[in-house]
C-alpha cells in the first residue's frame, strides 16, 4: 500500500504487518507502523513535515537517511537535512477540525496557507512577510470574511 502526496493530509492507519503502508513525497518516504499522523508536503515548498499524533512512523529522506519519530514530535525534511522537535500536534492538524492555527509563523507562511485554502493570491512585501504571527481562525467559505476580521489590509485577486 503506497500513497503519493503533494499537499497536506491527515491519516489514521491500522497496523497490518502483512500489508505495510507507505506515504511518499518528492523529498521523503514515510513507513507507517499503525498510527495517526499528518504530512505537509507541497512541491513548491522547501520544507516538508511529518507530525505524529499516535503510534510511530519511520521517515526516510531521498538520501536514505532515516529516523523514527514518537507522538507529539515533528520531523522536518529539507533535502538531505532531517530535524526532529517536540510540538503541539494540534498546531499542525487543526485544519481537520476546520480551524487554521498558526504559532510563531512568518506572515508569508500564513498567507501561503490562506492562499491554498481559499484559492486566492496574497502579495506581501518581503520585510513584512518576515513578521512572526500567532493565532487561529475558523475556516470559513469566504476569504473576505476572514480578512475583514484582521488588522491587515489585503488586495484579493482570484486565481
Where are these regions (language model features)?
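A residue-level detector for the "anchor" residue at the start of short, highly conserved motifs
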Residues: 1-159
Amino acid at each position: 500500500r503506497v500513497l503519493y502526496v503533494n499537499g497536506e493530509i491527515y491519516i489514521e492507519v491500522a497496523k497490518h504487518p502483512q500489508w505495510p503502508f507507505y506515504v511518499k513525497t518528492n523529498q521523503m518516504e514515510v513507513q507507517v507502523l499503525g498510527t495517526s499522523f499528518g504530512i505537509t508536503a507541497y512541491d513548491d515548498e522547501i520544507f516538508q513535515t511529518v507530525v505524529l499524533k499516535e503510534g510511530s512512523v519511520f521517515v526516510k529522506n531521498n538520501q536514505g537517511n532515516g529516523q523514527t519519530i514518537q507522538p507529539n514530535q515533528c520531523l522536518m525534511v529539507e533535502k538531505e537535512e532531517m530535524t526532529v522537535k517536540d510540538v503541539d500536534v494540534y498546531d499542525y492538524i487543526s485544519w481537520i477540525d476546520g480551524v487554521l492555527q498558526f504559532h510563531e509563523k512568518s506572515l508569508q507562511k500564513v498567507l501561503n496557507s490562506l492562499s491554498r485554502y481559499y484559492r486566492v493570491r496574497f502579495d506581501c512585501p518581503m520585510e513584512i512577510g518576515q513578521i512572526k504571527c500567532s493565532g487561529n481562525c475558523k475556516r470559513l467559505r469566504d476569504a473576505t470574511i476572514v480578512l475583514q476580521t484582521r488588522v491587515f489590509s489585503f488586495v484579493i485577486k482570484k486565481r
